[in-house]
Amino acid sequence: MSLRLTMQKKSFPRILIAAPQSGSGKTYLTCGLLRLLSGNGRRLHAFKCGPDFIDPLFHKQVLGIPSGNLDSFFTGEEQTLALFAKEAEGYDLSVMEGVMGYYDGLGGRLLTASSYDLARITKTPVILVINARGMSRTVVPLIKGLLSYTEESWIRGVIFNRVSSSAYRILTKCMEEIPGVKALGYLPELKDASWGSRHLGLIQPEEIPLFQNQIDALANQLEETLDLEALLSLAQSAPPLPPPSRSSSSGAKPSPSPSKVTALREEPTLLSPDQREEPALPFFLQKKVPIAIARDASFSFFYEENLRLLKEFGANPVFFSPMKDAHLPKASGLILPGGYPELHLQELSRNTSLLQEIRDAIESGMPTLAECGGFLYLQKSVQDMGGQSFPLVNLLPGSAHKNSRLVRFGYLELTAKAGQDLPYLPSGEKIRGHEFHYYDTDANGESCTAEKPVGGRSWDCMVSYKNLLAGFPHLYYESNPALIRRFVERCRGLDG
């Protein structure tokens, strides 16, 4: 499944919200902007730069629609641009939220997968969010340095965070020294403006008391202190892009698999596409295959692009709650995504009927993908934060426990080992993803080799058992759609 760009260009109004560093208020301000800009009947689409799961959940809560991830490490330049064009088509405005500091990419050393890289690939005007509390004229060399670091920075505007109206007047005078970059407004200190964190990121939006009220108050404040007309004009100034061709799942070739990580330059080099045989019938004409996908407070980390690709290959997602549903829904396949099962171990462990059904289904050969939290769920037991163990599915022999520090964090490329008979990833084939987890287990598997894109560090991982492929890595299916095509086809083969 490879999206291609056609030559005819089309307008996609868009902006990217970035910052010099993490903690500047990108997510908070992005959510307020989404609420504010969605007024007057505008149809908005949100995107997150990079692999993060939490920020798109905030975007989704504000807009009531899915938020996509765009990542140049996962999919390379052409495919990233095509994914944006496909998902943004039909919307009045796209708002992308950046990641970390503006130029922070792979390994903290490369530009690949940085906010700048996404702006460059998609030719998107960038608005910097600068936490200017306790700062005035220093913003000038700060912004000038970011502008001069590359030949074309794409930075066009600035919003100052945590400043008063009087401080903003001084800052706007300072900004007169920076031609081509406009001060678009400010956000003063607001009560309840700080959202807590867990593990690596923000807590989830449904856990914040009166979240919608907070966003409404934020949007009302921004309406008073932002130059909305100038911001919308900036979005309209984004150059036209070629829209994706209408290559659907009806026999489209899968996109290239990533190259060997050690050869990675600032832009990923991709192998030639897999010249697979096309199906006898296009996927959209074939019978839809029901695939059960865990989705609740324990399992909420699943890329919208992954879900869309499943559907394009003929899957009919059937969502269920491992916390509340006593039985597995009728389905021919199973996906257990990541999330925070460690926070809900008592509820998960008490649901013994579902635990048994999942174990029996996998033992009987049901095609199953499990990653991170879903991988923990399949273990014999998992300890909570206090060290108490809870029995879970008990399909895998491991016992999982929390570490005081991160076990692994960051991007990886997964390669199926030679001689391994993996159900969906042939020997030597690759797929890209990332890990971030404090939990570890004594049964991590050794069917694949994971390698970091910078530095070349590698380790064994992934469990392959019958039709199960499971491990800690979160996989981004668009980096090798052939894997998910094989998964759906195996589910279809078992669909009675």
Language model features with spans:
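C-terminal and late-domain segments of enzyme folds
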Residues: A119, F284-K287, F299-V318, P329, ...
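Intrinsically disordered, low-complexity terminal tails and inter-domain linkers enriched
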Residues: R4-L5, P240-Q286
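Phosphate-binding active sites in nucleotide-utilizing proteins
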Residues: P282-F284, V289-T352, Q356-A361
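A short helix->loop->beta-strand "cap" motif at the edges of active sites that frequently abuts
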Residues: T124, V181, E363-P367
